[in-house]
Amino acid sequence: MLEKCNAKHVVKIKANLLLKTSEVIEHCFHTDTNVDCTTVVYYLNTCDGFTHFENGSKIETVENRAVIFNSQIPHGGSTTSNADNRVVLNINIHTKS
C-alpha cells in the first residue's frame, strides 16, 4: 500500500478500533500530526461509519478504500452502529517528489 501511495518516508502509523454504539457518534475535527505531510486513512472493514471534513464532505467506510489528503486538513471519524467495530489505519507519510 505504501508503494501505491508513493511513500518515501513514514511519519506515523496508527490503528483505530472503534466499537459499535447504538447510534453513529461523530467525532471532533483534528489533524493527525503537526508535520506537513500526506495523510492516508485506510478502512479495514465496511460499516456505516465515516470520515468527515470541515467542508461538509463525508467518506463512507468501505473495506480496502483509502482516502488521501494533506495532513493539515482537519478531519474527524465516527463510530459504527451496524457492525461490531470500525477499524481504520491512519498513515502519515512524506511522498516522493
Tell where the protein language model's regions lie, with residue ranges:
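Fe(II)/2-oxoglutarate oxygenase catalytic core
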Residues: M1-R65, Q72, S78-V87, N92-S97
